[in-house]
Amino acid sequence: MKRSKTLRAADAKVDREKLYAPLEAVRLAKETSTTKFDGTVEVAFRLGVDPRKADQMVRGTVNLPHGTGKTARVLVFATGDRAAAAEAAGADIVGDDELINEIAKGNRLNEFDAVVATPDLMGKVGRLGRVLGPRGLMPNPKTGTVTMDVAKAVTEIKGGKIEFRVDKHSNLHFIIGKVSFTDEQLVENYGAALDEILRLKPSAAKGRYIKKAALSTTMGPGIHLDSNRTRNLLVEEDPAAV
């Protein structure tokens, strides 16, 4: 009962009818965080696209200026010098045929958060689509995870590069940091992600592109964001409205 009272108290602080400016939303999210551990801060978008149509798929990557607060575990499919370069860059798991067979059997799937592969191995890695695809982990040239420069890819992912892809319900969601981050760090991470989502707007998408946006912490209430705010994100009031 104590836990539910805490959650209700946090929920009561959020105005469900209001669209919050990013800075205001971040402050409120941190205030209403109910976990004893350092919770994550996540953003979710509902986009005005039909992901069933190839020309309306929204998929990309963004380098968050302050990272996510979590160091991603990276698996790399590579051989020879490329495998050595991946290991030197800090890859957590590196291998080729034997590792591909392990993953195909569904083993070790909880040991990594991102996958990189060299182009020459994609013929073999391709058969992992039914295992890695649903988890959003399939290497893709468009996101820089199919590359000969595996060291660079590993370094970027470890440094806070995140990959996003709209789901079948037209939603996008990803972590922008931890509750322990400063307000400015969280807003700047949000701004970097928002800029990239706007840049990737499909020309075939009609009507309003970002229909809804919300920010929340682990076990915290959802806070609706004013998705029209794309500039002056570190200002609590919208200068255009003053």
Swiss-Prot record:
Signal peptide: none
Domain of life assignment: Bacteria
SUPFAM superfamilies xref list: Ribosomal protein L1 (SSF56808)
Annotated GO biological process: regulation of translation; translation
This protein's UniProt keywords: Repressor, Ribonucleoprotein, Ribosomal protein, RNA-binding, rRNA-binding, Translation regulation, tRNA-binding
GO MF, any single term: tRNA binding
CC terms in the record's Gene Ontology section: large ribosomal subunit
CDD domains listed in its UniProt record: Ribosomal_L1 (cd00403)
Subunit comment: Part of the 50S ribosomal subunit.
Family assignment from sequence similarity: Belongs to the universal ribosomal protein uL1 family.
NCBIfam families according to UniProt: rplA_bact
Job description of the protein: Binds directly to 23S rRNA. The L1 stalk is quite mobile in the ribosome, and is involved in E site tRNA release. Protein L1 is also a translational repressor protein, it controls the translation of the L11 operon by binding to its mRNA.
Name used for this protein in its record: Large ribosomal subunit protein uL1
Native source organism of the sequence: Streptomyces virginiae (Streptomyces cinnamonensis)
Lineage summary: Bacteria, Bacillati, Actinomycetota, Actinomycetes, Kitasatosporales
